[in-house]
Design a protein with these regions (language model features):
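N-terminal secretory signal peptides and thylakoid transit peptides that target proteins
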Residues: 2-21
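C-terminal segment of N-terminal export signals and the immediately downstream linker at the start
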Residues: 28-83, 89, 93
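PLP-dependent aminotransferase-like
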Residues: 39, 115-204, 211
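Phosphate-binding glycine-rich loop
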Residues: 80-124, 138-140, 148, 215
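Active-site region of PLP-dependent enzymes
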Residues: 207-213, 220-339
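Conserved PLP cofactor-binding pocket of PLP-dependent enzymes
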Residues: 260-271, 315-317, 356-409, 438-442
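Conserved PLP-binding active-site segment of the aspartate aminotransferase-like
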Residues: 329-330, 337-348, 367-384, 406-420
């Protein structure tokens, strides 16, 4: 029998619905199938693929013979730090930037970065509240003051309009973070920063390989950091990299956490303490660097494969009333970390996110509520004893962050082709949507 609801491609769908103009992609083209008893009400669950096979699909990180060979070669080599220097060269070429420096994680790269900025104590830094604490907490070591900025409730990205409202004469830096691999509007952010005389530090810890206007994330700001932690798109188990457009910033960041041959400082440099650095050792582990180099060779292809699988799934799910995904600019290419982030409009769906997640989980899906911490609500920012200058902590929720925490949920990323499992995921969603009456009361 011919399908009365053929799957539309994304462009055709957007032309029909006008969803792009609304800033969200959603598809009301759904005819409910015959209702089946939900698994949570005693019915048979839809997702039946054995758990071991599901784990194989969703497993991350994924290391194969090339990675194992690279690590073993590093173990056998007498040039212990050769993989570290090689990774720096390759990452610099990949981004097209003048300076990079390895670190043992993204947090140490950020700490070095804040030192390298050489700002007077009390300087304010505009940071997203909805981020990992490492974006913010290292500021306290240098007397810097975080100013918490809201997130765009559609994309999770840095809310530039809120940043404009919070600008003061003490503002020196803004730190846009590319959440889940979604590129921020760096062209607009850079224009704002240039107009106001601000430094831009990209937190690209999630955005390895993402781009805007053909330019990689991490190459847009005055400076940037990356994390290579095991869950990231470029996983070395642990590691990080700082990116710098100016030699002086590069040298200050280097001397803060590196010494001896790693420092690479000229005799004329005011930061020429090659033998000692400034007392810290933030060097990346050479085996992690070897692993990262092997992973870098396949980064773009892995990202492309993940995008393709997300599209295969989402183009079907978005036909269900109330479901949408974060909109991506036509001139941007996002990556995905750590999940496939979606939104539920409870009014259009006819049931709550809580009821949906309960029903989907019972059907065997691995779906989670997208509740992201608002950093300004954590205790460390309100206890003045840890800060030279107390953070400016807004009362209550930031509205964009609150909206995200109300509507967001995540599905696991398919890291290998699994048509049977993907079909079961789609059927589980369709089954739940067809049982709206049962869910409305929950």
């Amino acid at each position: 029998m011919e399908n009365p609801n053929p799957i539309l491609n994304r462009r055709s769908f957007l032309q029909i619905t006008g969803a792009a103009a609304a800033g969200m992609t959603a598809a009301p083209l759904f005819a409910a199938p015959k209702t089946e008893t939900l698994a949570m009400s005693g019915g048979t669950k839809v997702v039946t693929l054995p758990e071991a096979e599901q784990r194989a699909v969703f497993r991350w990180p994924r290391y194969g013979p090339a990675e194992k060979e690279a690590v073993c070669a590093a173990l056998d080599s007498t040039e212990i730090y050769a993989p570290v220097k090689a990774l720096e060269r390759e990452w610099k070429a990949y981004l097209g930037v003048p300076f990079v420096k390895n670190h043992f994680n993204g947090t140490s790269a950020l700490a070095s970065m804040y030192f390298a900025l050489d700002l007077p104590a009390g300087s304010e830094i505009l940071v997203p509240s909805q981020t990992f604490f490492a974006t913010i907490v290292p500021m306290r070591l240098f007397g810097l003051v975080p100013i918490f900025v809201d997130s765009n409730p559609r994309t999770r990205c840095f809310d530039l309009e809120d940043a404009r409202r919070k600008l003061t004469p003490a503002t020196r830096v803004l730190v846009p973070m590319h959440p889940g691999g979604m590129p921020c509007d760096m062209d607009q952010i850079n224009e704002f920063a240039k107009d106001k005389g601000l430094i831009v530090v990209e937190d690209a810890a999630h955005a390895h390989g993402a781009s805007l206007k053909g330019k990689k994330m991490g190459a847009w700001g005055d400076n940037a950091i990356f994390s290579y932690q095991a869950s990231k798109p470029l996983p070395s188990l642990e590691g990080g990299m700082g990116v710098y457009q100016k030699r002086e910033t590069f040298e200050r960041a280097t001397v803060f956490g590196h010494y001896d041959a790693e420092a690479e400082l000229s005799p004329e440099s005011p930061y020429r303490y090659e033998e000692t650095g400034l007392g810290l050792k933030f060097r990346m582990h050479p085996l992690a660097a070897a692993l990262c180099r092997a992973q870098l060779k396949g980064l773009d292809q892995r990202n492309a494969d993940t995008r393709r699988r997300v599209r295969q799934l989402n183009e079907r799910l978005l036909q269900l009333p109330g479901l949408s995904e974060p909109p991506v600019r036509p001139d941007a290419e996002r990556v995905y970390y750590p999940n496939n982030h979606l939104h539920l409009d409870e009014a259009k769906a006819g049931f709550s996110r809580r009821a949906m997640l309960k029903a989907l989980t019972a059907e065997g899906l691995k779906a989670t509520a997208g509740h992201y911490l608002q950093q300004h609500k954590l205790r460390i920012y309100s206890e003045a004893k840890w800060w030279h200058h107390a953070p400016v902590v807004p009362p209550g929720d930031l509205p964009g962050c609150a909206q995200l925490n109300k509507t967001s949920f995540g599905l696991p990323l398919f890291y290998q082709d699994a048509p049977e499992l993907m079909e079961q995921y789609v059927k589980a969603f369709e089954k739940v949507w067809a049982s709206k009456a049962d869910l409305a009361a929950l």
